[in-house]
Amino acid sequence: MLQYQIDRIDHQTANDRSQTGTFLIGPLERGQATTLGNSLRRVLMGGLEGSAVTAVRIAGINHEYATIPGVREDVLDILLNCKQLSINSSNPELEIGRLVVSGPMEVKANDIQFSSQVEIVDGDKPIATIQEGHNLELEIHVERGVGYRPVDRRNQETTSVDLLQIDAVFMPVKRVNFSIDETAVAEGGTGRERLTMEVVTDGSTSPDDAIAEAANQLIELFQPLATVTMVEEIPEEPEPSPEAQIPLEELNLSVRAYNCLKRAQVNSVSDLMGFSYEDLLEIKNFGSKSADEVIEALERIGISIPQSRTSV
């Protein structure tokens, strides 16, 4: 199999602390670049775990359409600013940050007090502007997750009235682009390909770590296919036909034949289906006339039994 390598050929950090990494992967066999690019892009955009603000509590506010005295931004603006925070939490459980400030002040993300397990990537992100003589008190909930989680309206009814839920975007990768170009033709005329990938993150993780995590997820996904084991299917027992469930009484046999069969522990048509004509004749006091009677009764419901027992 052709061995390829991956090189990071460019890395940039923007003012908002988002990071862009460009990677060159190759040489690859024809068609492999598309497979690799699509697989990595899908995992990078939707499969990586990240952190996000999931709820905000504002003192004195119980719905998102309110305004706060002495604060330039309304509640919706503050919620949007909190939602856009780039945060990296190493705690798998809920983290709660708090903010208690007095104006005049322009509140920024760095003013929010979290535990040491939470890192605010873009500390200069504006949150709110407070006028002199007014206060602002916030409680911000941060969780880890994967993908996008909309507000659960049913859960909202059971939570505190003043806890404002936010649609959470846990995706640390903001954008992935890739392009494919052909390289030198190999011996025998087979073309080679080279994959160029551009990965843009929100700064809570680096493009290098994002690529590595996506690759590890794909390895875990495909690893079981390398050790496929054949499982022998156990044939299912055929369900008995309705006729087999008919009790012996409904065959309308003579009293003699009925009593002989009962003594032989024959209680239904299903039991009779295990007998041959010869087996019937071996039942005590069961003559050919009784055996013929049983054969005729079974034929009336569409069942026949063999003339002689099957030799094993």
UniProtKB/Swiss-Prot annotation:
Residues of the region (Alpha C-terminal domain (alpha-CTD)) are: 240-312
One GO biological process term: DNA-templated transcription
Query: Enzyme group, top EC level?
Result: transferase
Q: Residues annotated as region Alpha N-terminal domain (alpha-NTD)?
A: 1-229
Q: What EC number(s) does this enzyme carry?
A: 2.7.7.6
Name the domain of life this protein comes from: Bacteria
GO CC, alphabetical? cytoplasm; DNA-directed RNA polymerase complex
Keywords assigned = DNA-directed RNA polymerase, Nucleotidyltransferase, Transcription, Transferase
Q: Please give the catalytic activity noted in the UniProt record.
A: RNA(n) + a ribonucleoside 5'-triphosphate = RNA(n+1) + diphosphate
Molecular function GO labels: DNA binding; DNA-directed RNA polymerase activity; protein dimerization activity
Function, please?
Answer: DNA-dependent RNA polymerase catalyzes the transcription of DNA into RNA using the four ribonucleoside triphosphates as substrates.
Q: How does it assemble?
A: In cyanobacteria the RNAP catalytic core is composed of 2 alpha, 1 beta, 1 beta', 1 gamma and 1 omega subunit. When a sigma factor is associated with the core the holoenzyme is formed, which can initiate transcription.
The record's similarity note reads:
Belongs to the RNA polymerase alpha chain family.
Matches recorded under NCBIfam families:
PRK05182.2-2, PRK05182.2-5, rpoA
Domain free text: The N-terminal domain is essential for RNAP assembly and basal transcription, whereas the C-terminal domain is involved in interaction with transcriptional regulators and with upstream promoter elements.
Tell me what this protein is called. DNA-directed RNA polymerase subunit alpha
Task: State the organism's lineage.
Answer: Bacteria, Bacillati, Cyanobacteriota, Cyanophyceae, Synechococcales
